[in-house]
Amino acid sequence: MSGRGKTGGKARAKAKTRSSRAGLQFPVGRVHRLLRKGNYAQRVGAGAPVYLILELAGNAARDNKKTRIIPRHLQL
């Protein structure tokens, strides 16, 4: 009783995380949730957590005098 009729219809696509869409190994969904729960702003855009992660990683790379972001910079 899926409600798609006899032909079957389209099945739902496999879930894809926002981290994989952004090409990051960092939890974009978790950062977004924390931005919303932390009362930083009334509304938080979909790209805000991705930008925040990359901005902080870029700052860490610059502090280490590197021009390329590596996974270690995401952790710092």
UniProtKB/Swiss-Prot annotation:
<keyword id="KW-0379">Hydroxylation</keyword>
<feature type="modified residue" description="N6-(2-hydroxyisobutyryl)lysine; alternate">
    <location>
        <position position="37"/>
    </location>
</feature>
<feature type="modified residue" description="N-acetylserine; in histone H2A">
    <location>
        <position position="2"/>
    </location>
</feature>
<feature type="cross-link" description="Glycyl lysine isopeptide (Lys-Gly) (interchain with G-Cter in ubiquitin); in histone H2A">
    <location>
        <position position="14"/>
    </location>
</feature>
<dbReference type="InterPro" id="IPR032458">
    <property type="entry name" value="Histone_H2A_CS"/>
</dbReference>
<keyword id="KW-0295">Fungicide</keyword>
<feature type="region of interest" description="Disordered">
    <location>
        <begin position="1"/>
        <end position="23"/>
    </location>
</feature>
<feature type="modified residue" description="N6-(2-hydroxyisobutyryl)lysine">
    <location>
        <position position="66"/>
    </location>
</feature>
<feature type="cross-link" description="Glycyl lysine isopeptide (Lys-Gly) (interchain with G-Cter in ubiquitin); in histone H2A">
    <location>
        <position position="16"/>
    </location>
</feature>
<keyword id="KW-0539">Nucleus</keyword>
<dbReference type="GO" id="GO:0030527">
    <property type="term" value="F:structural constituent of chromatin"/>
</dbReference>
<keyword id="KW-1017">Isopeptide bond</keyword>
<keyword id="KW-0007">Acetylation</keyword>
<feature type="modified residue" description="N6-acetyllysine; in histone H2A">
    <location>
        <position position="6"/>
    </location>
</feature>
<keyword id="KW-0391">Immunity</keyword>
<dbReference type="GO" id="GO:0002376">
    <property type="term" value="P:immune system process"/>
</dbReference>
<dbReference type="GO" id="GO:0003677">
    <property type="term" value="F:DNA binding"/>
</dbReference>
<dbReference type="GO" id="GO:0031640">
    <property type="term" value="P:killing of cells of another organism"/>
</dbReference>
<dbReference type="InterPro" id="IPR002119">
    <property type="entry name" value="Histone_H2A"/>
</dbReference>
<dbReference type="GO" id="GO:0005634">
    <property type="term" value="C:nucleus"/>
</dbReference>
<feature type="modified residue" description="N6-(2-hydroxyisobutyryl)lysine">
    <location>
        <position position="65"/>
    </location>
</feature>
<feature type="modified residue" description="N-acetylserine; in acipensins">
    <location>
        <position position="2"/>
    </location>
</feature>
<feature type="modified residue" description="Phosphoserine; in histone H2A">
    <location>
        <position position="2"/>
    </location>
</feature>
<keyword id="KW-0044">Antibiotic</keyword>
<keyword id="KW-0832">Ubl conjugation</keyword>
<feature type="compositionally biased region" description="Basic residues">
    <location>
        <begin position="7"/>
        <end position="19"/>
    </location>
</feature>
<keyword id="KW-0597">Phosphoprotein</keyword>
<dbReference type="GO" id="GO:0042742">
    <property type="term" value="P:defense response to bacterium"/>
</dbReference>
<dbReference type="InterPro" id="IPR009072">
    <property type="entry name" value="Histone-fold"/>
</dbReference>
<comment type="similarity">
    <text>Belongs to the histone H2A family.</text>
</comment>
<comment type="subunit">
    <text>The nucleosome is a histone octamer containing two molecules each of H2A, H2B, H3 and H4 assembled in one H3-H4 heterotetramer and two H2A-H2B heterodimers. The octamer wraps approximately 147 bp of DNA.</text>
</comment>
<keyword id="KW-0158">Chromosome</keyword>
<feature type="modified residue" description="N6-lactoyllysine; alternate">
    <location>
        <position position="10"/>
    </location>
</feature>
<comment type="function">
    <text>Core component of nucleosome. Nucleosomes wrap and compact DNA into chromatin, limiting DNA accessibility to the cellular machineries which require DNA as a template. Histones thereby play a central role in transcription regulation, DNA repair, DNA replication and chromosomal stability. DNA accessibility is regulated via a complex set of post-translational modifications of histones, also called histone code, and nucleosome remodeling.</text>
</comment>
<protein>
    <recommendedName>
        <fullName>Histone H2A</fullName>
    </recommendedName>
</protein>
<dbReference type="GO" id="GO:0050832">
    <property type="term" value="P:defense response to fungus"/>
</dbReference>
<comment type="function">
    <text>Acipensins are antimicrobial peptides. Acipensins 1 and 2 have antibacterial activity against Gram-positive bacteria L.monocytogenes EGD (MIC are 1.1 uM and 1.0 uM, respectively) and S.aureus ATCC 33591 (MIC are 0.9 uM and 0.6 uM, respectively), against Gram-negative bacterium E.coli ML-35p (MIC are 0.7 uM and 0.3 uM, respectively) and antifungal activity against C.albicans 820 (MIC are 1.0 uM and 0.9 uM, respectively). Acipensin 6 has antibacterial activity against Gram-negative bacterium E.coli ML-35p (MIC=2.5 uM). Antimicrobial activity is reduced by high ionic strength.</text>
</comment>
<feature type="modified residue" description="N6-(2-hydroxyisobutyryl)lysine">
    <location>
        <position position="6"/>
    </location>
</feature>
<feature type="modified residue" description="N6-(2-hydroxyisobutyryl)lysine; alternate">
    <location>
        <position position="10"/>
    </location>
</feature>
<keyword id="KW-0929">Antimicrobial</keyword>
<dbReference type="GO" id="GO:0000786">
    <property type="term" value="C:nucleosome"/>
</dbReference>
<dbReference type="GO" id="GO:0046982">
    <property type="term" value="F:protein heterodimerization activity"/>
</dbReference>
